[in-house]
Curated annotation (Swiss-Prot):
It is found in: Cell inner membrane. Coiled coil: none annotated. It comes from Escherichia coli (strain K12). Its main location: membrane. It is a multi-pass membrane protein. Keywords: Cell inner membrane, Cell membrane, Membrane, Transmembrane, Transmembrane helix. This is Inner membrane protein YjgN.
Length: 398
């Protein structure tokens, strides 16, 4: 109750998006044409041009964002990865698997460092009212949340699953069914724990090391909450999986029967067309289930994240009021209508989605009450910093 009263006492500023679908559509058309003409070379500049348009038209508290990552930054990073890709291919073709493994491990190690430096550069190149964001973290902590923790959790999940398979009985048909149900429960809970824990720890780590000017963000997510909604999101997918699986299994049985009892080619063709129709229906049911699960998980975790994000020791807070159904039909429209129109409707629908998200995002407090001063920080220099600037061109939710 105290939090609600405090939020009612402070001014609330919703994010405002000033971009239009028509303008964004023209930008995308020009980008596609230039990318085709240049045989894909222009793609990094096209992507950054779109991102700069979105940032420049996003406003909060009367001020707009600015985004300074260039296509050249992304292009240099892409060249680095292309070089490594062909180097690994050459070692494989030259029958030097050991060298290929060493190069792959080296790329993996470099990728972790590059991701951290890329996030730092992206934050420094993003500003609001002339005040830059910044991202500073220890590489030890970054390695832990992005590499070692996921691996250890995956090993733990695999171990639990393996032990469970050995402990469950399989002496009769009924015991096999019970074992399969229990294994499914173990799998769902394990996936929920994995996804929820990683989201909670990674987002807390990233944003606790992010600053706006001289003011530091703080966020502490409830890991139990994240695990709960990760499990519920997976459970929401199960009915769709069951229906789609039943349709596919039924069609497999029908296909087997038709191969045994079919009398002529016409009957075979009719059964084949009917099978294809039902297979398409099963795929559509499955994809819709993915959309339901994804929208539920996205809205639950984003709302929780924003409600726990604060700036300058809580003087500035945030609130997100996205709804499940709002996210669901926008996601479906974005995929389905974009597919039907060959991608032509994508720019319009994306702006529609961004505008809706902006209207449901609120800043609680007044940025003008804070001393808006930039940190004395400059972008990192050197070879590793240069090739890292295009690796992470987006900080989550920034």
């Amino acid at each position: 109750m105290a939090q609600v009263i405090n939020e009612m006492d402070v001014p609330s500023h919703s994010f405002v998006f000033h971009g239009t679908g028509e303008r964004y559509f023209l930008i995308c058309v020009v980008n596609v044409l230039l990318t085709i003409i240049t045989l894909g070379i222009y793609l990094p500049w096209a992507l950054m041009k779109c991102k700069r348009y979105l940032y420049a038209n996003m406003e909060v508290n009367g001020q707009r964002f600015s985004y300074g990552i260039t296509g050249g930054n992304v292009f240099v990073s892409c060249l680095f990865f292309v070089f490594f890709y062909f180097a690994i291919l050459m070692t494989v073709s030259a029958d030097m698997p050991l060298v290929g493994c060493v190069l792959t491990l080296l790329l993996l190690v470099l990728l972790i460092f590059m991701a951290a430096k890329g996030l730092r550069h992206q934050a420094l190149m993003t500003s609001l009212n002339g005040v830059r964001f910044s991202f500073n973290c220890s590489m030890k902590g970054f390695w832990w949340v992005t590499f070692f923790l996921p691996i250890l959790m995956a090993i733990g999940m695999g171990t639990v699953f393996f032990i469970s398979t050995k402990m469950l009985p399989a002496n009769s048909s009924s015991s096999v069914i019970i074992s399969m149900v229990l294994m499914a429960i173990v799998g769902i809970v394990s996936i929920g724990i994995f996804n929820g824990t990683l989201y909670s720890l990674v987002m807390s780590f990233l944003w606790s090391n992010t600053s706006f000017g001289i003011h530091r963000f703080k966020v502490k997510l409830d890991t139990t909450y994240c695990i709960k909604y990760a499990i519920l999101a997976f459970l929401a997918l199960l009915p769709f999986l069951a229906v789609a699986g039943y349709i596919i299994f039924d069609q497999i049985l029908n296909a087997y029967d038709s191969s045994v009892y079919a009398n002529d080619d016409i009957e075979n063709l009719q059964q084949f067309m009917e099978m294809q129709r039902k297979m398409i229906i099963a795929q559509l049911i499955y994809y819709f289930g993915i959309a339901v699960s994804t929208s539920y998980l996205t809205v639950s975790l984003r709302n929780h994240f924003m409600s726990n994000l604060s700036l300058n020791d809580g003087r500035i807070r945030f609130r997100l009021t996205l709804t499940y159904h709002g996210m669901l039909y926008r996601m479906c429209a974005l995929v389905v209508i974009s597919g039907i129109t060959g991608g032509l409707a994508y720019p319009l629908l994306k702006i529609w989605m961004i505008d809706w998200q902006a209207k449901n995002t609120y800043l609680l407090g007044d940025l003008d009450d804070l001393p808006l001063i930039n940190k004395e920080e400059q972008p990192d220099k050197g070879f590793l910093a240069s090739i890292s600037r295009g690796v992470m061109p987006s900080l989550p939710f920034l």
